[in-house]
From Swiss-Prot:
One of its GO terms (biological process) is pyridoxine biosynthetic process. This is Phosphoserine aminotransferase. PANTHER family: PHOSPHOSERINE AMINOTRANSFERASE. InterPro entries: Aminotrans_V_dom, Aminotrans_V_PyrdxlP_BS, Pser_aminoTfrase, PyrdxlP-dep_Trfase, PyrdxlP-dep_Trfase_major, PyrdxlP-dep_Trfase_small. The modification N6-(pyridoxal phosphate)lysine is found at K197. SUPFAM superfamilies: PLP-dependent transferases. Pathway: Amino-acid biosynthesis; L-serine biosynthesis; L-serine from 3-phospho-D-glycerate: step 2/3; Cofactor biosynthesis; pyridoxine 5'-phosphate biosynthesis; pyridoxine 5'-phosphate from D-erythrose 4-phosphate: step 3/5. Keywords: Amino-acid biosynthesis, Aminotransferase, Cytoplasm, Pyridoxal phosphate, Pyridoxine biosynthesis, Serine biosynthesis, Transferase. It is found in: Cytoplasm. Binds 1 pyridoxal phosphate per subunit. Signal peptide: none annotated. It is an enzyme of class 2 (transferase).
Amino acid sequence: MKDIFNFGSGPSMLPKIVLKKIKRDLFNWKNTNVSVMEISHRNKNFLKVIENIKNDIKFLLSVSNDYNIILLQGGARAQFSGIPMNLTNNFSDLADYINTGYWGMYAAIEAKKYCSVNIIDVIEKKDKLSILPMKNWNISKNSVYLHYCPNETINGTAIYETPKFKNKIVVADFSSTILSRPIDVNKFDIIYASSQKNIGVSGMTIMIFKKNIFLKQNKFTPSILNYEIIYKNNSLFNTPPTFNWYVSGLVLKWLIDQGGVKKINNINKIKSKLIYDIIDKSKFYKNNIYDEYRSYMNIIFYLPNKKLNNLFLKLSKINGLLFLKGHRAVGGIRASMYNSMTIKGAKKLANFMKYFEKRYG
């Protein structure tokens, strides 16, 4: 069987060693004679899974004791509602939302249902895309919190700058970049990330939040989105997707075995450089983002026309390079290079790009 590499934006590929472990556990998890999908979420073995996930997140991101960690059901999009409902209690409360692209804007649109929103555009379009430095963000003095998305999967942009806003609650959607590079958690009040890119399979969102941050909750906040209630119930306010959480636990152990976040960050830089170098040396492939704002996780590039774009997708699939089609909003090609993507996979894509340009350029 030839090597297959999944460059999809999420759900992403999983490490082979994790897939093999899942296969072994599928019918008899921890000598219980049942699958992990059948086990009670109150079972002592599964309670240990939850504890391990939290401890491994703390270890990998150096999370201090000033923060709590909860596991939420569903994707990050639900938190576009949950965040304003847990931080504001009426429409007169103001929140700053940074428009970094598709997801940053979508979060702002959802928040408007619960509070006043000040949308701050930070994307600059000249010859290429760039992002305003944080010191030039027009933050409101009286806003309750600031929300932004450090990595935009659709636009292929990233913000690597660390926030330094005084007396401001800083909230960040790290869904597509969590655990891919070191971050200073202490510079944030709330970090949340869905699991289907760098943490496991879809169905879970991890949230790290500063203790006592939720002091102004909307009285209409559903209990299932009330972060304090979820924390007090050990993330078990209702039955969780046990299999999803189990897989996330395996992926976190795998990342620790790889050497942690610093080591995987170096690998991610190598992978992305293999692709960006080809783009930058080529007159055939185009990327419209300045280097310092390019995402390591989601590489966007364009071919000269739609016909070549479609041919690239067809032939790449035949060669075991899957799910490279760009998002419908921007088109082109998107190569998502999450933690589980190997250097071997990145090299295979790079070699295919060279071949395709030589053959059709």
